[in-house]
Amino acid sequence: METLRIKTDGLTQQVLAAGPVDGPLVVLVHGFPELGISWRSQVKALGEAGYRALAPDMRGYGGTDRPDRREDYTILHLVGDMVDLVRSQGRDQAVVVGHDWGAPVAWHCALMRPDLFRAVAALSVPFQPRIPKGPPTLLMKALSKRLGLGEFYINQFQSADAHLEFEADVAGALRRGFYAYDGATPDDRRSTGFQPEGTTFLSAVPEDATLPPWMGEDHFAEYVAAFTASGLKGALDWYRCIDLNWTLTAAFQDRRIEVPAAFLVGDRDPVRVYAGQHEAGLKDRAPDLRNQVVLAGAGHWVQQERPDEVNAFLLGFLSRL
């Protein structure tokens, strides 16, 4: 594996890469609060299997550029960055894989540019269609009220200074975040995504939160160093563009994912509390869905918690394209 700096039309991207330069291209899109290194096991496995694997630090993260304006983090920018990355390699096709926030990016790559992204695989977050009644933050508030679990964290993240709590103690914030969504964390200590009154995404996590079993100190130090240097404003600006995304994607209302697709989620992933309802209808929205897996015992950080199973899932999907 190697770390590259690739200049695209919109920005300079830091990319973890492996595999023959002429191998079939696979782009891996991380989520929050992660980096391209969250795909290290997959980049290695794909490279060894003959694929050209690229895992960028996404816009606003790590070694990739961080625009200042909130409105520069829309889904159109994020998909555009992946289009530019593919083009920078002299390619006209790629498979896109996404996890967490990277899953909606991957789904929208396939939705908006099926000519370029010939297949899509997503982890943790199923495709969620645009709901005409939006905007999303209002629907999320209604969901919070209906479930009675407290305020939804994405609504809390809309605050212009929400990132400051993370930046005040980067190591502590990351430790709590990884712990709260990990499959090994006891049920009564894992997050639901909804915060009791008077708490935040971070303060609701127990103070004695530890690193997940799969997260070594050296690996954790990489995250801490990257987010200490970059801050988390850009990362949270992704969330602050959710309503703007809803406005910008009106032209894609009711459009389906037509390329081959695959989806995997851990059965202990807290995202299922608020997005799991979309798993049942995934085949209707992605008619060429070829594999849908619920991985027993796995939490949210599935490609790092259970790398061997995720590698087998991806390689199996790719081999049948």
Label each residue range with its predicted role.
Residues 40, 107-111, 311:
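Short, hydrophobic alpha-helix immediately C-terminal to the catalytic nucleophile
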Residues 32, 36-39, 101, 107, ...:
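Signature tryptophan residues that serve as conserved aromatic anchors
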Residues 1-2, 12-13, 25, 61-97, ...:
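Flexible "cap/lid" subdomain of the alpha/beta-hydrolase fold that forms the substrate-access gate
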Residues 17-65:
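Conserved HGGG/HGGXW glycine-rich cap/lid loop of the alpha/beta-hydrolase fold
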